[in-house]
Amino acid sequence: MYPVPTVIEQSSRGERAYDIYSRLLKDRIIMLSGPIEDNMANAIIAQLLFLDAQDSGKDIYLYINSPGGVVTAGLAIYDTMNFIKSDVQTIVMGMAASMASVLASSGTKGKRFALPNSEILIHQPSGGAQGQQTEIEIVAEEILKTRKKINQILADNSGQSVEKLNHDTERDNYLSAQEAKDYGLIDDIMENNKLK
């Protein structure tokens, strides 16, 4: 694991050392990086709730660089983003794949961004099953329900039809930042801290 950098700040009361993520949190920045799983989701949710309770009138900035991950963990973040009063700006840097693409597109409308060389990947959910035929059938039905739910969210976020999403997520569908903007998954491309 990569060591977490420490930032030292001077104040009238002396020095204070923060890990970089705690320092960014002071500026209402949350980093969603790496695979989405329950522990990561709980940390992201806690930060969203904390920042919203602190000042629900200010935006929260969610930076995303993730290959995706567990759908239920991602949907917990998605539900929290929609539950809180604060606007959530999403900024894709690097990759927002699979469940991360759902979160990237779920930021507050007009405040969904990507950096110029970012990629967004949309596809159908994957999963596996073993055991008796009835158990495999139950898992297959659950994957189909999940696909329907995810495609509905992506359709709502992008303005595309569910039918188009069903077709476009049949296989891995990689989108550049510009293609993601044209598709409606993001609103703008951010370059040099400006919108393109």
Curated annotation (Swiss-Prot):
Q: What is its EC number?
A: 3.4.21.92
Q: What is its main location?
A: cytoplasm
Q: What NCBIfam families does the entry give?
A: clpP, PRK00277.1, PRK12553.1
| Family the UniProt entry places it in | Belongs to the peptidase S14 family.
- The residue ranges crossing the membrane are none
Instruction: List GO terms (cellular component aspect).
Output: cytoplasm; endopeptidase Clp complex
Task: Describe the task this protein carries out.
Answer: Cleaves peptides in various proteins in a process that requires ATP hydrolysis. Has a chymotrypsin-like activity. Plays a major role in the degradation of misfolded proteins.
Subcellular localization(s) per the UniProt record: Cytoplasm
Hydrolase among keywords: yes
Enumerate the catalysed reactions: Hydrolysis of proteins to small peptides in the presence of ATP and magnesium. alpha-casein is the usual test substrate. In the absence of ATP, only oligopeptides shorter than five residues are hydrolyzed (such as succinyl-Leu-Tyr-|-NHMec, and Leu-Tyr-Leu-|-Tyr-Trp, in which cleavage of the -Tyr-|-Leu- and -Tyr-|-Trp bonds also occurs)
Which proteins does it associate with, and in what oligomeric form?
Fourteen ClpP subunits assemble into 2 heptameric rings which stack back to back to give a disk-like structure with a central cavity, resembling the structure of eukaryotic proteasomes.
Q: Which SUPFAM superfamilies match?
A: ClpP/crotonase
Q: Which superkingdom does the taxonomy of this entry point to? A: Bacteria
Q: Which GO terms of the molecular function aspect are on file?
A: ATP-dependent peptidase activity; ATPase binding; serine-type endopeptidase activity
Instruction: List the catalytic residues.
Output: S98 (nucleophile), H123
This chain belongs to the protein called ATP-dependent Clp protease proteolytic subunit
Matching InterPro entries: ClpP, ClpP/crotonase-like_dom_sf, ClpP/TepA, ClpP_His_AS, ClpP_Ser_AS
Keyword tags:
Cytoplasm, Hydrolase, Protease, Serine protease
Q: Which GO terms describe its biological process?
A: protein quality control for misfolded or incompletely synthesized proteins
